Amino acid sequence: MTKKNEEERGKVDFIDASGEQLLTCPECGFEYVHITKAEVFMRGEDEDNHTHVTADIEDHKTEIEKVKGMGRNPSGRRDGLILTGYCEEGCNFEIEMAQHKGNTIVKSNYLGKKVYDWANWQIKIRSR
């Protein structure tokens, strides 16, 4: 496991593993990462409305909705993607991908740390 320093936190990285690339946690760098939700935003350039598709792996639900305005779309003008997940060190995060003028912009959002309350069998999210 590679621990990230303050400057590296939030950066989306991959490590080489037997000819494949493994996504690491954008917060701490741990390589055991699980994706729990995918959100896709389909929008024609500068259109007012877009289609938002959500596949929630933990809840076993898929939703499709028409949205007026930006909603959660990470792109202000076009299509976007948000992957939500966690690492086995407990970090919760989102990875956003947005299109802008031919570029694909990638950023992550730290959502807090999973805290296990084994006495009450609960999982709580704690921010930094």
Place the predicted regions along the sequence by residue:
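Short, charged low-complexity linear segments at domain edges
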Residues: 1-9, 45-70
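Short, flexible, mixed-charge glycine/proline-rich loop motifs
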Residues: 10-22, 75-81
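Structured alpha/beta or helical-core interaction and ligand-binding surfaces enriched in interleaved
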Residues: 24, 34, 39, 54-57
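Short cysteine-rich clusters marking metal-coordination/redox-active sites
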Residues: 25-29, 87-89
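Short, non-ligating residues that shape and space the ligands of small metal-coordination modules
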Residues: 32-35, 93-97
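Short cysteine/histidine-rich metal-coordination sites, predominantly Zn2+-binding motifs
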Residues: 40-52, 102-111
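Cysteine-rich micro-motifs
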Residues: 47-54, 84-92
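A short, surface-exposed interaction/processing loop segment used at functional sites
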Residues: 100-128
